[in-house]
Design a protein with these regions (language model features):
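Active-site-adjacent alpha-helix immediately C-terminal to a catalytic or transition-state-stabilizing loop
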Residues: 125, 205-263
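Universal eukaryotic N-terminal targeting presequences
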Residues: 1-4, 48, 264-265
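Active-site-proximal alpha-helix that buttresses catalytic centers in soluble enzyme cores
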Residues: 5-139, 143, 152, 244
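Residue-level signal for well-ordered alpha-helical positions
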Residues: 130-131, 169, 237-238
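A short, well-structured juxtamembrane/interface segment
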Residues: 99-105, 203-210
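Phosphate-handling substructures
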Residues: 68-90, 133-208, 259
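Residues at the C-termini of beta-strands that transition into short coil/loop
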Residues: 63, 145-147, 249
């Protein structure tokens, strides 16, 4: 596509090699990614390419089922966050029950998924395992912190388990952690400091990079199992209920990745 003979696979390799570098500071990541795209003369027409590629994909989103912090958040005021601020909360009994309706919706969609992307937070991983039986056996299951919940230094609910613990706990499952290389992955990318919240700009940058990654991957049918803020900031939407299954609007995804490409501080 580019006048230097770079293929889509070359672009995909570029993106994935960046993702595997250990999730360096997201702004530097973004700067380097666009610099590399410019070097291979793709940036001039990449927006049209991305729009075409995303138009060929069916992308579905499941928000994790109800978890312990959802119940407590509804009970206590935000300024009482110490009463509901549970680190890496698990699903409630109601949440476990909710996944049955998610499974039914998946059956009704009747989609053969090529790849499932899962947030590394426990509530998302649990949701995956509860619907796993209703997914086709040959789907790739990729765990990535690029679709973790937005990082706020005060909120323990979005701090998870160390990567080594995740790999050990799920070593006999289909979960693939190859794109996660950082032991402490739940802080602002590249800044392992409790005082460092992610901020909206960095959050949108990582989501835009993730959408770019999806666009250049070969899979057609994709499922994301993630969080409410991820959905709202990928789509022109006010929200999504726990365990709901939604087909994503690809035009909204194009807008988000275009914002990432155009962003300059």
């Amino acid at each position: 596509m580019g006048n230097k003979g770079y293929s889509d696979n070359d672009i995909l390799s570029l993106i994935e090699s960046s993702i595997k570098q250990g999730n360096a500071d997201i702004e530097k990541f973004h700067e380097n990614l666009l610099s590399n795209l410019n070097k291979i003369d793709k940036i001039k027409n990449i927006k049209a390419i991305i729009e075409k590629k995303l138009s060929e994909k069916n992308i579905y989103f499941i928000r994790h089922a109800e978890s312990e912090h959802n119940v407590l958040e509804a009970k206590y005021a935000y300024d009482e966050f110490e009463k509901w601020n549970i680190q890496d909360p698990k699903l409630t009994k109601k949440g476990i029950e909710q996944t049955k309706s998610a499974s039914e919706k998946l059956k009704n969609f009747n989609i053969h998924f090529d790849t499932v992307f899962v947030s590394p937070l426990t509530r998302a991983i649990q949701t995956y395992f509860l619907i796993e039986k209703d997914l086709n056996n040959d789907a790739k299951i990729i765990v990535t912190d690029f679709i973790k919940e937005v990082v706020n230094s005060q909120l323990d609910k979005n701090k998870g388990k160390k990567l080594s613990l995740l790999k050990e706990e799920y070593k006999n499952t289909k979960l693939d952690f190859q794109y996660m290389t950082k032991e402490i992955w739940w802080y602002n990318l590249g800044k392992e400091i409790d005082k460092e919240s992610e901020g909206q700009t960095n959050f949108l940058l990582r989501l835009g990079i993730f959408i770019l990654w999806m666009a250049f991957r070969p899979e057609k049918n994709i499922l994301l199992i993630s969080h409410s803020h991820v959905f709202v900031n990928m789509q022109e939407s006010f929200g999504i209920r726990n365990a709901d299954v939604v087909k994503m609007n690809n035009n909204d995804l194009v807008k988000k990745v275009n914002w990432m490409i155009n962003y300059s501080d």
